[in-house]
Amino acid sequence: MKGGKKLKDLYSPEAYQRISAYFKDSLKTALALYQNMKPGFLTALLYPKMMTCSSTISVDEAIMNLAHENNIGISGFETMAMQAAVFDSIPYEKQAEELLKVIDSIGNSLIQFKLMLQAYKDQQLHDIEKIINDPVFGVEEDRDLLLDKRNKHWVEQLKEIMKKGTVFIAVGAGHLVGKNGLIELLRAEGYTVRGLENRE
């Protein structure tokens, strides 16, 4: 974090202890290891814990592994520095509140995460948007920063990338939905966007 701020500086001793206990008991790691990390990044560490499958790798990793195995080139929309800048735009105190809220309501967070996965499998875009706007996810207030502006930037990149041939594009579900989601932005640019049958 900027200015030498530490994670423990953002919480009361009691709140910090609640987060520390969760990381120790549920994530099997010490919160002390993450003192310099932005709370928004720490919130992202919680999502694998909400997964019901036994896989130890993320979807991103699985896709990258497939690409490497088949000698397919990979490129990203953003650098780590660009992603960090997004979180620097949101006050650390606000990020800290969101992290605590997710941990304190972990039961509801788990339910919403499972609903999100099912809505994604069923290609129910309206349901996905409704879920990401739930206060549990802490996205709605900062949607412009976390999703909309980034989507618009990504579409400009995609217009150039797709000129080169067939591409596989993987993004988080939240980036797909809404009037400023990638689906509608691509349609506005004249692209035909349709769902494919989900075969399990």
Task: Label each residue range with its predicted role.
Residues M1-L145:
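Structured, acidic catalytic/metal-binding patches in enzyme active sites
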Residues E140-E200:
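A cross-kingdom marker for long, charged
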